[in-house]
């Protein structure tokens, strides 16, 4: 099967790590162009050293390159505002081009590979939510397939050192996009997301806490569902793991808790603690937050490439 050529817009931490993953591990993908806006960026310099074509003139520079004619999939690792403009420009030049959005822009549907990749594989634009969303939404979905989830809250703690200018510029969009995706993909009636930039030295690994309030159900069934989901995520993010056993608390009907936007709740509270260790392809091992984004985007693109190849075969 011939590989599909891809371009990455954004030569920062995420874009560079993703490029290295594609060059080393791409099964159905061929790294064609790295796009940036800073001619002095380390990402563009590294791409050139690795034999990848580059431009420092942004999406316009990409569209003016001869390589653009053969590109089927574009990853956007810029910012939410920039992605809206990039999508419009690329769509006008190539209506059928596939975009994988690693910003919180969310023009297309949210995609969390282990939960809903199959139903989104033929979309022209998919959004990879956020690092916190990729880590925690599978856990919410794991509870949702056993019991009705009324509320889910996630706290993502990431090393301050791993948060580049793009991440910092998108903090508000991070919380909004993650909260919405907890509902749309995770299956919660109400979702809430909090991000913490931890300045500790040496930097700590990404840690995530997930609280899920659901109807009462078998605790064994919920724990089994969570463990099964964690294994599925590990297939494309090897450093993803449960930090400790799942914990439960029954909230009795005569002592309900009051949830903003939900009302009074009684039922089962499930608490999950996660840790994500990065693969250290370009970034340090503590930057699991960036690794889970690039790994999820890579898994999505691989499936898209297979789908495009099948369609090309059917049309031939």
From Swiss-Prot:
Q: Give the gene that encodes this protein.
A: mhpF
Q: Does the keyword Oxidoreductase apply?
A: yes
Q: Which residues bind NAD(+)?
A: 11-14, 162-170, 289
**UniProt keyword annotations, A-Z:** Aromatic hydrocarbons catabolism, NAD, Oxidoreductase
- Record-given protein name: Acetaldehyde dehydrogenase
What does the record give as the function of this protein? Catalyzes the conversion of acetaldehyde to acetyl-CoA, using NAD(+) and coenzyme A. Is the final enzyme in the meta-cleavage pathway for the degradation of aromatic compounds.
Q: Record's family?
A: Belongs to the acetaldehyde dehydrogenase family.
Q: How does it assemble?
A: Interacts with MhpE.
Domain of life, per the record?
Answer: Bacteria
Gene3D superfamilies found in the cross-reference section: Dihydrodipicolinate Reductase, domain 2, NAD(P)-binding Rossmann-like Domain
Return one GO MF term. acetaldehyde dehydrogenase (acetylating) activity
UniProt-listed InterPro entries: Acetaldehyde_dehydrogenase (IPR003361), Acetylaldehyde_DH_C (IPR015426), NAD(P)-bd_dom_sf (IPR036291), Semialdehyde_DH_NAD-bd (IPR000534)
Please tell me the species this chain comes from: Escherichia coli O81 (strain ED1a)
**HAMAP family membership:** Ac_ald_DH_ac
Metabolic or biological pathway, per its Swiss-Prot or TrEMBL entry: Aromatic compound metabolism; 3-phenylpropanoate degradation
Q: Name one GO biological process term.
A: 3-phenylpropionate catabolic process
For this protein, what reaction is catalysed?
A: acetaldehyde + NAD(+) + CoA = acetyl-CoA + NADH + H(+)
Q: What is its EC number?
A: 1.2.1.10
Q: Name the top EC class.
A: oxidoreductase
| Keyword NAD set for record | yes
Q: Catalytic positions? A: 131
């Amino acid at each position: 099967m011939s590989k599909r050529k891809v371009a990455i817009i954004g030569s920062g931490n995420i874009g560079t790590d993703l490029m290295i993953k594609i060059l080393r591990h791409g099964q159905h993908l061929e790294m064609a162009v790295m796009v940036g806006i800073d001619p002095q960026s380390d990402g563009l310099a590294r791409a050139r050293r690795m034999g990848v074509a580059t431009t420092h003139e942004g999406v316009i520079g990409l569209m003016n390159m001869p390589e653009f004619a053969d590109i089927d999939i574009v990853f956007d690792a810029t910012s939410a505002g920039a992605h809206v403009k990039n999508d419009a420009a690329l769509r006008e030049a190539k209506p059928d081009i596939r975009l994988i959005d690693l910003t919180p822009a969310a023009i297309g549907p949210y995609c969390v590979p282990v939960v809903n990749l199959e139903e989104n594989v033929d979309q022209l634009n998919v959004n990879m939510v956020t690092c916190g969303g990729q880590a925690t939404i599978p856990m919410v979905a794991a509870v949702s397939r056993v019991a009705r989830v009324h509320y889910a809250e996630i706290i993502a703690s990431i090393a301050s050192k791993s948060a580049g200018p793009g991440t910092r510029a998108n903090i508000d969009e991070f919380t909004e996009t993650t909260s919405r995706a907890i509902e749309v993909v995770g299956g919660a009636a109400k979702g809430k997301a909090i991000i913490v930039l931890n300045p500790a030295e040496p930097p700590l690994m990404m840690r995530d806490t997930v609280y899920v309030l659901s109807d009462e159900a078998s605790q064994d069934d919920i724990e089994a569902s969570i463990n099964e989901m964690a294994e599925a995520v590990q297939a494309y993010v090897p450093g993803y793991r449960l930090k400790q056993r799942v914990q439960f608390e029954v909230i009795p009907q005569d002592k309900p808790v009051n949830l903003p936007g939900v009302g009074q709740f009684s039922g089962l509270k499930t608490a999950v603690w996660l840790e994500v260790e990065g693969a250290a392809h370009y970034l340090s091992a503590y930057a699991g937050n960036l690794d889970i984004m690039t790994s999820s985007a890579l898994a999505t693109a691989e499936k898209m490439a297979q789908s495009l190849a099948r369609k090309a075969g059917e049309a031939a």
